[in-house]
Structure formats: structure tokens, C-alpha cells
């Protein structure tokens, strides 16, 4: 079955340079930066985890490739469940409140992981709570995306593209820092504290977002 979804964007830029000229307007807008920060931070957790997670699995828990693969699948499951929840409650909760809720849940994940790992040394103590963290991220992404494109409505396309670029850059930088420092610190503590820091920053940026 084929359905023609007609074009809905009629204010197209003449060329790429015309689009780039709109970036200063976005870059100087707090309404753009706050949801973009939340969006980028909620994505950077994957950069941290997918560098730190395998290191912890091999160096700390000495897991087999099969078990490590199972443990590394938890983030995907959490993210999907978060997306499903958003689709059910988006009509009754504002996008800003969804961002705040997601940030709180994201923050709780590594806190629980850190607590359990220090009291009970087991792979699931570290990896299972990560599902909670990505569940929060799954709530944040759709909500923050909506806020980004609403920041300056006539620049929605530019905002979406620039926001995604910032998200990718921040995630890459987080992964870079993880790769540098994890070898010199306690791997579990470092990953958890780094993720907790991201959760705190995500919470404050979502809390300060001025929803339109």
C-alpha cells in the first residue's frame, strides 16, 4: 500500500548558504539552546555507555562475548520502552514536563547502578539499571525534538539539523573523554559518576526550558 504524504514545508531555503545564514538567529536563542542541550545530553549517555560498558564487561567482570552482548542490549530495550510510553502520554503531559520526567529517570539509572555495584558485585548490578537510564532518554528525545523545532517556528528545519549536529558532537566528545579516562580510574565508578553528571545537567536544562 502506497500513501502520498505531501510536502508540508513550504518555506524552503534557496540554497545551503541561505540556510546557514539563519544559524546566528538560532545560536543566540535560549529557546533553542535549552531543549537542544537536553536532547544532546540525553544522547551522550550512549557515547559514554558504549565506550565504558564493553570495557567494564571485559576488564571488570570478564564476561564472555555472548553475555556481554546480552548486557549491551539493555539500553536499546529501555529506549524503546521510553518511546512507547511517550506515545501513550504525550497528549496529557506537556513536552517540557516529559523532558523533566525523562531527565529524572535518566539520573536515577546510574545512581542505582552505582549503589548496587558497590554492595553486590555482579554484572547485572551494573548493566540492568542502565535500562532505566535509557528509558528516561527514550522519553526525552521525542519531547526535546518537539521543543527544538518549536523554538523558532519559521526556522524549524534549520533548528532540527543544527540540533542533531550538536547532539552528535556532544556524544562524540563524551565518548572521547570516556575513552581517555576510564583506564586510569575505577571503571564502574567513573562511568556511573559521568552518567550521573549528565543526568543532572539534563535535568536543569529541561527545567529551564520555556515551552511554547
Residue locations for each model-derived region?
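Helix-to-loop junctions at the C-terminal end of transmembrane segments
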Residues: 82-95, 182
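C-terminal membrane-cytosol helix-exit motif in multi-pass small-molecule transporters
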Residues: 1-10, 205-206
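Juxtamembrane intracellular "pre-TM" segments in multi-pass secondary transporters
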Residues: 6-36
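A late C-terminal transmembrane helix in Major Facilitator Superfamily
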Residues: 145, 149-184
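Pair of pore-lining "gating" transmembrane helices in MFS-fold secondary transporters
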Residues: 29-48, 131
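A membrane-interface helix-boundary motif in multi-pass transporters
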Residues: 64, 178-198
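C-terminal transmembrane helical hairpin of 12-TM major facilitator-type secondary transporters
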Residues: 97-141
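Short amphipathic helix-loop junctions that connect adjacent transmembrane helices
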Residues: 51-66
Amino acid at each position: 500500500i502506497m500513501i502520498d504524504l505531501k510536502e508540508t514545508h513550504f518555506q524552503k531555503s534557496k540554497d545551503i548558504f541561505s540556510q546557514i545564514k539563519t544559524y546566528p538567529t538560532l545560536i543566540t536563542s535560549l529557546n533553542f539552546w535549552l531543549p537542544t542541550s537536553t536532547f544532546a545530553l540525553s544522547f551522550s549517555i550512549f557515547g559514554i555507555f558504549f565506550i565504558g560498558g564493553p570495557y567494564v564487561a571485559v576488564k571488570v567482570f570478564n564476561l564472555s562475548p555472548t553475555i556481554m552482548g546480552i548486557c549491551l542490549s539493555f539500553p536499546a530495550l529501555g529506549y524503546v520502552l521510553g518511546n512507547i510510553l511517550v506515545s501513550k502520554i504525550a497528549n496529557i503531559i506537556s513536552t517540557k514536563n516529559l523532558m523533566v520526567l525523562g531527565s529524572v529517570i535518566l539520573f536515577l539509572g546510574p545512581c542505582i547502578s552505582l549503589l548496587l555495584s558497590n554492595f553486590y558485585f555482579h554484572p547485572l548490578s551494573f548493566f540492568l539499571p542502565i535500562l532505566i537510564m535509557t528509558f528516561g532518554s527514550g522519553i526525552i528525545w521525542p519531547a526535546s525534538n518537539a521543543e527544538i523545532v518549536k523554538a523558532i517556528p519559521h526556522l524549524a528545519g534549520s533548528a532540527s539539523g543544527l540540533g542533531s549536529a550538536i547532539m552528535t558532537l556532544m556524544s562524540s566528545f563524551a565518548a572521547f573523554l570516556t575513552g581517555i579516562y576510564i583506564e586510569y580510574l575505577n571503571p564502574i565508578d567513573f562511568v556511573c559518576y559521568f552518567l550521573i553528571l549528565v543526568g543532572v545537567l539534563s535535568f536543569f536544562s529541561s527545567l529551564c526550558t520555556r515551552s511554547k
